[in-house]
Structure formats: structure tokens, C-alpha cells
């Protein structure tokens, strides 16, 4: 009888040990999950437990365009997209190509053949539009014998219909402005050429109208000038 009771007690003890073990394992799993959880998302522990204060959630800060930049200032950046780049392009080569527009920052993704030119309005409020225009005028120029694509982009990312429509309208307007600028440049250049030709012709005619000395053939008189 005594041996049977010992066996029963042993079974009870085993069950108790297994119960304690499973409870300990569950507690450990909870602790691991708490440690792996991102800071700010961990459950708050009650004040007084283990003498620790409740964990305070950290407030996330937004980065990029529209978010707060350094020293709490609001970011005011404009981005120009550059596509169809050669895969072996370097940051130095790209910077040299766009040196006249002087972008404040260049983010190159050579493996995808794209780059982003950032212009900071807080650094240059008066000249930022001119610098962006210079960069955008390089649309279709050759870089390492490859024609590149330069256009405005809309901040925020994503492929929502509203964003794509906004981007499309911006680039249509930009293309029209680019054509107008090129036409104006051509017309200005032609006017300068016409003015130069007219001035040269006036000088030549003024020289030809000089009186020819008596007794000398006009052709010989030209040689004597």
C-alpha cells in the first residue's frame, strides 16, 4: 500500500512540476516578446512593480519633406527626378553634369539608374527657382552618351491616383514652360545675329561709300585701303 501511495504522490509531483514548467515557459515567452517589441509599443507596467516606473512611449518624429527638420524647423525642399542614367555613373560625374544648377544634395541610386536632386528653399529663397530651371533644362542632354530624363517629382512617395495625376500635370506644365524658354532663347539668339549682321553691313557700306580718288580704278582703290 505504501508503495502505491508513493507512486501516486510521484505522479502528482510530476504534474505539478510540468505545470510550473509550462507557466515558466509562458512567462519567458512574454518577456521575450516585450524585449522584441519596438520601443514605444511595449505595454506599460504598473507603478510599484519591481520598483520600476511605467515605460513612457516615445513620440515619433516625421522626416523628409513637410516634416520637422533639424532644430525643429519645417523642411522646405524641392526634388527633381533624374532617370535613364548609365548604370556605371558615379556621384562625382553626376555632380559635374549638374554643376550649373548647384543642387544642395544628390541622392544617387546607380543600380536603378536614377537620382534625386534636392533644392533647399531655406538656404536660397531667391535663387532656388532659377537653379531648378537650369537643372530641368538639362532634360534630354547626353551623359556618357546616354540621353537622360529630368523632371519634377511630387514628395510623399506612393502610387496613388491623385499623386500620379498631380505629377502628370506638373510635368505637362513644365514641358510647356521648357519649350517657351527654348523658343525665347532661339529668338533672342536670332535677334542678336540679325543685329550683328546689320551692324557689320552698315560698317561695310560706310567704308564702300568713301570717294574714289580720281584716275584710279575702283577695284584698285579697294586694294589700296
From Swiss-Prot:
**CDD domains referenced in this protein's UniProt entry, alphabetically:** RRM_Nop6
Residues that span the membrane, as ranges = none
Keyword rRNA processing in the entry? The reply is yes
| InterPro entries found in the cross-reference section | Nop6_RRM, Nucleotide-bd_a/b_plait_sf, RBD_domain_sf, RRM_dom
Give the Basic and acidic residues compositional bias ranges: 21-42
Record-level GO BP terms: eukaryotic translation initiation factor 4F complex assembly; formation of translation preinitiation complex; maturation of SSU-rRNA; ribosomal small subunit biogenesis
Output compositional bias ranges, type Basic residues: 9-20, 56-75
Does the keyword section mention ATP-binding?
A: no
Q: Name one GO cellular component term.
A: small-subunit processome
The UniProt entry, under PROSITE patterns, shows:
RRM
* Swiss-Prot/TrEMBL keywords: Nucleus, Phosphoprotein, Ribosome biogenesis, RNA-binding, rRNA processing
What are the subcellular locations of this protein? Nucleus, Nucleolus
* Residue numbers carrying Phosphoserine: 45, 160
Please share what else the UniProt entry notes about this protein: Present with 8970 molecules/cell in log phase SD medium.
Q: Which family, according to UniProt? A: Belongs to the RRM NOP6 family.
Q: What protein am I looking at?
A: Nucleolar protein 6
Q: List the gene name.
A: NOP6
Amino acid at each position: 500500500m505504501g508503495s502505491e501511495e508513493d507512486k501516486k504522490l510521484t505522479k502528482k509531483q510530476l504534474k505539478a512540476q510540468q505545470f510550473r514548467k509550462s507557466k515558466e515557459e509562458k512567462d519567458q515567452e512574454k518577456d521575450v516578446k516585450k524585449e522584441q517589441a519596438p520601443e514605444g509599443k511595449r505595454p506599460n507596467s504598473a507603478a510599484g512593480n519591481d520598483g520600476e516606473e511605467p515605460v513612457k512611449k516615445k513620440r515619433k518624429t516625421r522626416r523628409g519633406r513637410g516634416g520637422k527638420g533639424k532644430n525643429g524647423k519645417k523642411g522646405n525642399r524641392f526634388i527633381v527626378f533624374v532617370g535613364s542614367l548609365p548604370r556605371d555613373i558615379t556621384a562625382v560625374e553626376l555632380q559635374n553634369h549638374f554643376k550649373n544648377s548647384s543642387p544642395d544634395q544628390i541622392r544617387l541610386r546607380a543600380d536603378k539608374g536614377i537620382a534625386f536632386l534636392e533644392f533647399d528653399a531655406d538656404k536660397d529663397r531667391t535663387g532656388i527657382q532659377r537653379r531648378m530651371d537650369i537643372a530641368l533644362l538639362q532634360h534630354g542632354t547626353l551623359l556618357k552618351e546616354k540621353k537622360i530624363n529630368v523632371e519634377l517629382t511630387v514628395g510623399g512617395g506612393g502610387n496613388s491616383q491623385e499623386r500620379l495625376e498631380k505629377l502628370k500635370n506638373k510635368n505637362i506644365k513644365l514641358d510647356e514652360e521648357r519649350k517657351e524658354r527654348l523658343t525665347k532663347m532661339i529668338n533672342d539668339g536670332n535677334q542678336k545675329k540679325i543685329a550683328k549682321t546689320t551692324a557689320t553691313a552698315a560698317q561695310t557700306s560706310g567704308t564702300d561709300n568713301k570717294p574714289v580718288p580720281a584716275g584710279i580704278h575702283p577695284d584698285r582703290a579697294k586694294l589700296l585701303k
